[in-house]
Amino acid sequence: MFINRWLFSTNHKDIGTLYLLFGAWAGMVGTALSLLIRAELGQPGTLLGDDQIYNVVVTAHAFVMIFFMVMPIMIGGFGNWLVPLMIGAPDMAFPRMNNMSFWLLPPSFLLLLASSMVEAGAGTGWTVYPPLAGNLAHAGASVDLTIFSLHLAGVSSILGAINFITTIINMKPPAMSQYQTPLFVWSVMITAVLLLLSLPVLAAGITMLLTDRNLNTTFFDPAGGGDPILYQHLFWFFGHPEVYILILPGFGMISHIVTYYSGKKEPFGYMGMVWAMMSIGFLGFIVWAHHMFTVGMDVDTRAYFTSATMIIAIPTGVKVFSWLATLHGGNIKWSPAMMWALGFIFLFTVGGLTGIVLANSSLDIVLHDTYYVVAHFHYVLSMGAVFAIMGGFVHWFPLFSGYTLNDTWAKIHFAIMFVGVNMTFFPQHFLGLSGMPRRYSDYPDAYTMWNTISSMGSFISLTAVMLMVFIIWEAFASKREVLTVDLTTTNLEWLNGCPPPYHTFEEPTYVNLK
């Protein structure tokens, strides 16, 4: 029965497929919103109307891309599909809770869309800072609906995190230690721990904001002894781990892709890679106030957060150089997935370098809330997380579907996307250095040239998205079945065929440990 299979599913592969489809759909919405932003900024003057509607679009773009595209695809899609296969588990630890985690997302998405349809919309930015998000500056239901949307997405992620942690620790073969699980499994487990520790703090913050708006509490209102800076601390204590949540599963996927297409049987420095991810996860919790260098913190506080932020570059560097060392001396296969992985390593490193610049509290005073910050986080997200997703997708698509993509088209798609995202975001560094502020729908004529180039780049990326839809259609229409898979001894997920049967590892797995 269709309903029994897709609505009441308890199968990790089906739920993973649902997550991938939902994430792809949300990605289209998020892309459309980003194109609205770039259309508005393509030339001076107004296109959409006032700044409120512009900021509603910006806010929705952020929420859709983060909570409904990257997280569902990386953690829900790839995580559900691959983690049980990689550790030889028959399914997730809590299969019905797994289904609920997914089905909380469409209602959450619906609430977010509703928030932009009522009143004037939530034009707060994804940070939802009071007093702008208070009931004076944002009267009406919009911000409340956004808060409810975040609550649902948060519950979904917390339940998913519990599920993954339990599965990864508890459902390995008895003889297999944690240090024999693949790096993608590690990355998902560390991501789940970050989610479990950070999301409750966000929930507390937005719940207090909700009561400030509706029940006359004053958590964030100085008139009643509250402090809007408290909200910023609560939000960023979640918000900074969140950005590592978005990239860590990508690290895991890139490790697998680089190892596979270098013809290696293991990544360089496995233990170092695990240590690096754990370090990044830990450090991610003690650097949050680097988002707040302009709110008037003590000089010693700023010095600490500057130093702590820079320390994160060390484990990140360990990962980058280990990927390069994995490539070294390998029999490199120039597949589309490998191109995405190499693009990831290069562009993620560029994004990391601008992050080191922003970590300096003195420089950040000048660069805060300019397009330099936008350029920085889009290099690590739009070219880090997205390139990892694309690399993972073209690498594991034959496993998920049983069909192969057209290699040539996939490489053309990569080339168009590479040109598009770089043309979009590289000029934004220049805009930021010349002082163009974020979150404005219009700008002085002096900024016209780089904005026009940036907007042209975004439309190149759009053609890449449309080409990807065609490539996937072409694969299903042509039905080229998978013939053989290399290196299955060190890539267990391929062991059961392409696609694997509905139920895998129904009997306990026999592991021969070397």
Swiss-Prot record:
Fe(II)-heme a binds at residues 61, 378. Keywords: Calcium, Copper, Electron transport, Formylation, Heme, Iron, Magnesium, Membrane, Metal-binding, Mitochondrion, Mitochondrion inner membrane, Respiratory chain, Sodium, Translocase, Transmembrane, Transmembrane helix, Transport. Mg(2+) binds at residues 368-369. Na(+) binds at residues 40, 45, 441. Its EC number is 7.1.1.9. Binds 2 heme A groups non-covalently per subunit. Binds a copper B center. Residues 1-11, 87-94, 171-182, 262-269, 328-335, 401-406, 479-514 are mitochondrial matrix. Residues 41-50, 118-140, 213-227, 287-298, 358-370, 434-446 are mitochondrial intermembrane. Belongs to the heme-copper respiratory oxidase family. Component of the cytochrome c oxidase, the last enzyme in the mitochondrial electron transport chain which drives oxidative phosphorylation. The respiratory chain contains 3 multisubunit complexes succinate dehydrogenase (complex II, CII), ubiquinol-cytochrome c oxidoreductase (cytochrome b-c1 complex, complex III, CIII) and cytochrome c oxidase (complex IV, CIV), that cooperate to transfer electrons derived from NADH and succinate to molecular oxygen, creating an electrochemical gradient over the inner membrane that drives transmembrane transport and the ATP synthase. Component of the cytochrome c oxidase (complex IV, CIV), a multisubunit enzyme composed of 14 subunits. The complex is composed of a catalytic core of 3 subunits MT-CO1, MT-CO2 and MT-CO3, encoded in the mitochondrial DNA, and 11 supernumerary subunits COX4I1 (or COX4I2), COX5A, COX5B, COX6A2 (or COX6A1), COX6B1 (or COX6B2), COX6C, COX7A1 (or COX7A2), COX7B, COX7C, COX8B and NDUFA4, which are encoded in the nuclear genome. This is Cytochrome c oxidase subunit 1.
